[in-house]
Every structure is written in structure tokens, then in C-alpha cells.
Curated annotation (Swiss-Prot):
Family: Belongs to the LCL2 family.
Origin organism lineage: Eukaryota, Fungi, Dikarya, Ascomycota, Pezizomycotina
Keyword field: Signal
GO biological process, alphabetically ordered: ERAD pathway
Keyword Signal assigned: yes
Organism: Aspergillus oryzae (strain ATCC 42149 / RIB 40) (Yellow koji mold)
Protein name: Long chronological lifespan protein 2
């Protein structure tokens, strides 16, 4: 009887230690709980626009300062796209242009879709 009780107790201790090790593994794997989430949140930039306003005010430009990229150009439609690898610049009319997502389209496809929309076909 004592032998059975000792075996049962040993099995329970083994099971408890395996379960504890398993939970420690998952806790470590997923960032260690709340402390990691607090650390990650501290890395985010605030949603305050003062940083952008400071950059705008300190920019040196005697022509036109593009609001999206802070590039200094002669005319507003000369402003570059903020993400040229992912956007195509399309001139809509004299003096106006937009940057539109390429969205995985073939080269020139975004401009064609804008033209179709302008004609009322799309």
C-alpha cells in the first residue's frame, strides 16, 4: 500500500514539473506576459502632430513645400510620392496630382484605372 502511494505521489510530482516547464516555455515564447507588452507600447510614436509641425517650420524652402514629403519643389504637382516603391504619381489636371497605390497592378495600370474613372467607365 505504501509502495503504491509513493509511486502515485512520484507520478504527480513528475506531472506537475512537466506542466510547469511547459507553461514557462510558452510564457517565454510569447513575450513573458505584461512586461513585454508595456515595453512594446513604449516604442510607439505618439499621435501628436507636433513633431511634423516642427519639421515643417524648420524646413528651408523658398518655393513650394510639399505637405506629404516636405520636399521643396517649384510647383505643387511636382511633389514626389511619399512611398515611390508602392505608389504611382498621376497628374489629374494642370497643377494637380495624386499618389495612388500600385496595389500589385501591372506598370501603368493605376493610371489607366484613374483615366477610366475620369471618363465615367469605371
Amino acid at each position: 500500500m505504501l509502495h503504491t502511494w509513493i509511486r502515485t505521489l512520484g507520478a504527480l510530482l513528475l506531472l506537475a514539473s512537466v506542466a510547469h516547464a511547459q507553461f514557462q516555455f510558452f510564457e517565454h515564447m510569447f513575450g513573458g506576459g505584461r512586461q513585454e507588452h508595456q515595453q512594446q507600447a513604449a516604442q510607439n510614436e505618439p499621435s501628436d502632430s507636433s513633431r511634423y509641425q516642427n519639421m515643417w517650420e524648420s524646413a528651408q524652402c523658398d518655393k513650394y513645400l510639399c505637405p506629404g514629403t516636405l520636399a521643396c519643389v517649384h510647383f505643387p504637382h511636382h511633389c514626389p510620392c511619399a512611398h515611390p516603391d508602392n505608389e504611382d504619381k498621376i497628374e489629374l489636371s494642370e497643377g494637380s496630382a495624386v499618389c495612388i497605390s500600385k496595389g500589385g497592378f501591372q506598370p501603368g495600370e493605376a493610371a489607366r484605372k484613374i483615366e477610366l474613372a475620369r471618363k465615367g467607365v469605371l
